[in-house]
Amino acid sequence: MALPLLQYKPSSQNHRVTSFGAADQNEDTPYIYRIEDVSSYTDIQNIIWASYRQVFSEHEILKFNRQKTLESQVKNGSISVRDFIRGLAKSEAFYRLVVSVNNNYRLVDITLKRLLGRSSYNKDEQIAWSIVIGTKGFSGFVDALIDSEEYTKNFGENIVPYQRKRMEGRPHNLVTPRYGEDFQEKAGTVQTDWRFTLDKFYSRKSQEKQLREGDPRKFADLAASVGNQGNYAQRISAFDIDYLNAVPNRSRR
């Protein structure tokens, strides 16, 4: 028997504020992709790529992450946009890139942002959904979100999820990398290569080492700055010197 979802209290977020209509429209207002607006091949392609951007995040759209079977099904109308989003979130690529590299709490927050268009309300909500992941698996968690009343009310069958009422700050996909700090050491992003560290340390120490007075190495920079132009002795004959003009005439006042 599956455990019921634990109760949690929603916190204040922009998407919970009643819309003021046109007053809410600004440069941050997202473009809403609807299947009803499709009138050409380009339009359906835009919906597909908007779905990839939302689910996989902007910096994770690569050719080998494409789900061509799902793309074909949504193009010919076999599945709705809702099921296309569901399929992307359950794909092996999403599991490899996002699910496998996060703990359950962070995974809940990321998935809420990408499927429901909002951040988790608080730690209580993260705990509640983490229990769902523990009992039903990630696939069951995705179904719970996609089939939820919140998803149905905001996106229905034919709208690509988007960040709801982003009035300030940057988009979720730019501030939420696919894995957190606890996975960085495993990924090797913070591991130190001691070979380069020691080489850099001893190079700096060599430069800062104090030399004794009179050590020629102290004058290496000075010697290098001296020009290489030769100053050779001039050859001149005594007969070439005009002594009469060279000696001042002291008889004149």
Curated annotation (Swiss-Prot):
Q: Does the keyword Thylakoid apply?
A: yes
Name the GO terms of the biological process aspect: photosynthesis
Mind telling me which InterPro entries this protein's record contains?
A: PBS_linker_dom (IPR001297), PBS_linker_sf (IPR038255)
GO cellular component terms, semicolon-separated: phycobilisome; plasma membrane-derived thylakoid membrane
Alphabetically sorted, this entry's keywords are: Antenna complex, Membrane, Photosynthesis, Phycobilisome, Thylakoid
What membrane topology does the UniProt entry give?
Peripheral membrane protein
Q: What is its main location?
A: membrane
Compartments, as annotated in UniProt: Cellular thylakoid membrane
Where the record annotates domain PBS-linker, the positions are 11-191
Which family, according to the similarity comment? Belongs to the phycobilisome linker protein family.
Q: What does this protein do?
A: Rod-core linker protein required for attachment of phycocyanin to allophycocyanin in cores of phycobilisomes. Linker polypeptides determine the state of aggregation and the location of the disk-shaped phycobiliprotein units within the phycobilisome and modulate their spectroscopic properties in order to mediate a directed and optimal energy transfer.
Summary of subunit composition and partner proteins: Part of the phycobilisome, a hemidiscoidal structure that is composed of two distinct substructures: a core complex and a number of rods radiating from the core.
* Name this polypeptide is given: Phycobilisome rod-core linker polypeptide CpcG4
Which species does this protein come from? Nostoc sp. (strain PCC 7120 / SAG 25.82 / UTEX 2576)
Q: Which gene encodes it?
A: cpcG4
